[in-house]
């Protein structure tokens, strides 16, 4: 039995979960998420708990058992509390600013980079060297944060670039002179 898969997902007050065939819809104070799962997984809602069971111990079913439970738990967490990723910008002249719905990044290129977040994702710029990505879908928040980071990944010599706030950049030593 999967250690993660056999744990029930506790549904907090104010969150409703509906299961139709293999489609799970989670509604909460922050919004609504819908996702289709593998039809072999049995998803049951009993009171304020949701359980995921697999039909047998075949390898294909074992691999998606814990994943299905984790995805549903993230959906419940997202509509209840939401998710956020913080990015830090380091480097001389590197900065971000918000203009209306989009953010403009000056990252040492000959042109500024403009990024408009997708529907359901909110991007804040509290200081010109910090970006906060918020949303109800953990997957989409992580994707947008990774996309913004990819515009200028931290380089190993001086550490300049966009990094996650909890990321540790491994530094390299420069060339040794004669």
Curated annotation (Swiss-Prot):
GO molecular function, one term: rRNA binding
Family annotation (Gene3D superfamilies): Ribosomal protein L6, alpha-beta domain
GO cellular component, one term: cytosolic large ribosomal subunit
One of the protein's GO biological processes: cytoplasmic translation
Keywords per UniProt: Ribonucleoprotein, Ribosomal protein, RNA-binding, rRNA-binding
Highest taxon listed in the record's lineage: Bacteria
Function: This protein binds to the 23S rRNA, and is important in its secondary structure. It is located near the subunit interface in the base of the L7/L12 stalk, and near the tRNA binding site of the peptidyltransferase center.
Subunit (UniProt): Part of the 50S ribosomal subunit.
Recorded family membership: Belongs to the universal ribosomal protein uL6 family.
Protein name (database record): Large ribosomal subunit protein uL6
Gene this protein is translated from: rplF
């Amino acid at each position: 039995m999967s250690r993660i898969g056999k744990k029930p997902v506790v549904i907090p007050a104010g969150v409703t979960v509906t299961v139709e065939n293999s489609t799970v819809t989670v509604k909460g104070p922050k919004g609504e998420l819908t996702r289709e799962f593998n039809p072999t997984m049995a998803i049951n809602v009993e009171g304020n708990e949701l359980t995921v069971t697999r039909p047998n111990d075949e390898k294909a079913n074992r691999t998606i058992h814990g994943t299905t439970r984790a995805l549903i738990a993230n959906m419940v967490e997202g509509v209840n509390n939401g998710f956020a990723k913080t990015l830090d910008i380091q480097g001389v002249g590197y900065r971000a600013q918000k203009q209306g719905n989009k953010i403009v990044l000056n990252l040492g290129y000959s042109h500024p980079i403009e990024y408009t977040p997708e529907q359901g994702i909110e991007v804040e710029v509290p200081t010109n060297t910090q970006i906060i990505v918020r949303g109800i879908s953990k997957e989409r928040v992580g994707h947008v944060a990774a996309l913004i980071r990819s515009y200028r990944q931290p380089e190993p010599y001086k550490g300049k670039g966009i990094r996650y706030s909890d990321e540790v950049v491994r530094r390299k030593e420069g060339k040794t002179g004669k």
